[in-house]
């Protein structure tokens, strides 16, 4: 095992248009096969669409969507004496943001709209209003943690 400890977290550079690290993270989640320019174009177009549809600042819409999607609890498998328990644990803030963005992008890709810009825009708007598949995923995760609360004493 390495003795140096974990690698330090590198700071995220805020994106040039909205000056927000959250938008940079969203671009990184959308990015496929190194095509950053395409990912940025998609995200900026989706955020502009959010501005037109909702009439509010797109970064505020994104933050509201993230607040509705970020989980506070999740379950982790823990093996105790031959049995595997689903143990509820609190989610660290950085992981909560990562999970929230991952779910937003995953469920945006699964939507039925024609273009990715429309899919991402509508998923963001739905999530900011407390609707959509990403919010449902968070509710399911919390429900799972709630139903396994009896195993919380196995936490590590």
UniProtKB/Swiss-Prot annotation:
GO MF annotation list: rRNA binding; structural constituent of ribosome; tRNA binding
**PROSITE patterns in alphabetical order:** RIBOSOMAL_S7
Quote the cellular component terms of the Gene Ontology held in the record: small ribosomal subunit
Cross-referenced InterPro entries, in alphabetical order? Ribosomal_uS7 (IPR000235), Ribosomal_uS7_bac/org-type (IPR005717), Ribosomal_uS7_CS (IPR020606), Ribosomal_uS7_dom (IPR023798), Ribosomal_uS7_dom_sf (IPR036823)
Which cysteine pairs make disulfide bonds? none
> From the record, what ranges are coiled-coil?
none
Biological processes per GO annotation: translation
Q: Keyword rRNA-binding on this protein?
A: yes
Superkingdom of origin organism: Bacteria
Q: Which UniProt keywords apply?
A: Ribonucleoprotein, Ribosomal protein, RNA-binding, rRNA-binding, tRNA-binding
**Stated family:** Belongs to the universal ribosomal protein uS7 family.
The function of this protein is: One of the primary rRNA binding proteins, it binds directly to 16S rRNA where it nucleates assembly of the head domain of the 30S subunit. Is located at the subunit interface close to the decoding center, probably blocks exit of the E-site tRNA.
User: What assembly does the database describe for this protein?
Assistant: Part of the 30S ribosomal subunit. Contacts proteins S9 and S11.
Q: What is this protein called?
A: Small ribosomal subunit protein uS7
What is the protein's species of origin?
Salinispora tropica (strain ATCC BAA-916 / DSM 44818 / JCM 13857 / NBRC 105044 / CNB-440)
Write the lineage as a comma-separated list: Bacteria, Bacillati, Actinomycetota, Actinomycetes, Micromonosporales
Q: Which gene encodes it?
A: rpsG
């Amino acid at each position: 095992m390495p003795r140096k400890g974990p690698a330090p977290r590198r700071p995220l550079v805020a994106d040039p248009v909205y000056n927000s690290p959250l938008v940079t993270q969203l671009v990184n989640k959308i990015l496929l096969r190194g095509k950053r320019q395409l990912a940025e174009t998609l995200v900026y177009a989706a955020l502009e669409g959010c501005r037109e549809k909702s009439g509010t600042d797109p970064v505020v819409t994104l933050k509201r969507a993230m607040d509705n999607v970020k989980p506070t609890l999740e379950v982790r498998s823990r093996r105790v004496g031959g049995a595997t328990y689903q143990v509820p644990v609190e989610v660290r803030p950085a992981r909560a943001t990562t999970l929230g963005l991952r779910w937003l992008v995953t469920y945006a890709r699964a939507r039925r709209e024609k273009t990715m810009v429309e899919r991402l825009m509508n998923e963001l708007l739905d999530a900011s209003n407390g609707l959509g598949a990403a919010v449902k995923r968070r509710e399911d995760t919390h429900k799972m943690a709630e139903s396994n609360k009896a195993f919380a004493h196995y936490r590590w």
